[in-house]
């Protein structure tokens, strides 16, 4: 939506974007190799040459198939994830590493039966009763036949960042886009 708002301005109508859906590590390497001007990604530590601008906070929620036993509970806690097969994010992705850190810091060991690249794939498998999942609350999960349950014992938030090289030449269109996102695109 942010890109659409940017392009809807008359002064930006001749700017084009190329979109790629890749893991954070691959996107960061692409920035370093000048394949990309900017990327939307998770935060990565130990990247001193990259500026990470937080732009969106996404609540993390548990999704289940309709009629799942968790939908009958008055509240769902993070430890409930241990009781059922879990569909997870790809372990090498930003969200995969984030979720693994959540599980570790809360002392739980879910039974991950399958890993997927994104919420669309995860929610499709959950809808088909392959398991439950902890996911970012994004539009894709609302389009599937799943129940969306808030985690009641801890508030979990994943932040999406706009990232770019700190000391690299940028054409005016890229500078304008970054400035636009900083001014109008952040939803924290």
Regions found by a protein language model. Name each.
Residues 1, 85-106, 170-178, 188:
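Secondary-structure junction motif
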Residues 8, 79, 159, 163-188:
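Extended ligand-binding regions for polar small-molecule ligands
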Residues 47-54, 58-59, 73, 120-167:
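Beta-alpha-beta core module
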Residues 15, 31-40, 60, 108, ...:
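Alpha-to-beta junction loops
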Residues 65, 72, 89-90, 112, ...:
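Thr-Gly-centered strand-to-loop micro-motif
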Residues 47-60, 64-86, 172:
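Flexible hinge/capping segments at coil-to-helix
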Residues 28, 32, 52, 78, ...:
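Short hydrophobic/charged patches on amphipathic alpha-helices used for structural packing
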Residues 1-48, 115-116:
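Central regulatory/effector-binding core of bacterial HTH transcription factors
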């Amino acid at each position: 939506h942010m890109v659409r708002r940017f392009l809807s301005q008359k002064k930006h109508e001749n700017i084009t974007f190329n979109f790629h859906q890749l893991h954070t590590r691959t996107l960061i390497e692409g920035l370093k190799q000048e394949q990309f001007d900017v990327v939307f990604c998770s935060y990565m530590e130990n990247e001193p040459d990259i500026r990470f601008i937080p732009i969106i906070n996404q609540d993390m929620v548990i999704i289940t198939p309709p009629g799942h036993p968790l939908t009958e509970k008055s509240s769902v806690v993070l430890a409930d994830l241990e009781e059922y097969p879990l569909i997870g994010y790809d372990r090498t992705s930003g969200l995969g590493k984030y979720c693994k850190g959540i599980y570790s810091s809360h002392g739980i060991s879910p039974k991950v039966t399958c890993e997927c690249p994104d919420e669309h794939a995860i929610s499709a498998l959950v809808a088909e009763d392959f398991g439950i999942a902890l996911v970012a609350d994004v539009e894709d999960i609302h389009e599937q036949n799943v129940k969306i349950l808030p985690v009641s014992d801890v508030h979990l938030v994943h932040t999406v960042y706009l990232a770019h090289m700190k000391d690299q030449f940028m054409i005016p269109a890229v500078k304008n886009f970054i400035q636009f996102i900083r001014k109008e695109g952040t939803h924290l």
